[in-house]
């Protein structure tokens, strides 16, 4: 398998990314596509988790719901925090809202992002107020 290390300058010059179709690769490439809109994706997974992430990334709604998709919850938490001057409520199914997200939220807040719990501390749903991060290091 050929390995490619991507950085911003490489991605900006890409037209398309061909992936294996795995859910893991698909979710990661969807985040890249949200940052670099010129990319087209070949062989995107048809999994429910990937569809949920793609739907939420393309939504113009303030209230986002990931259902049972844990990867979408975590990826969206980090991605939405970077969208300056935008506010979101991110939630999931009853079961998703019982799954801890505190370590990720603390790390992002320690970097200068603005994420708050709407209900129970350490668990979704969360409010995300997008901003520019102020730090580049965090201790976990």
What do these predicted ranges mean?
Residues 1-140:
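Structural preference for solvent-exposed beta-strand-turn elements
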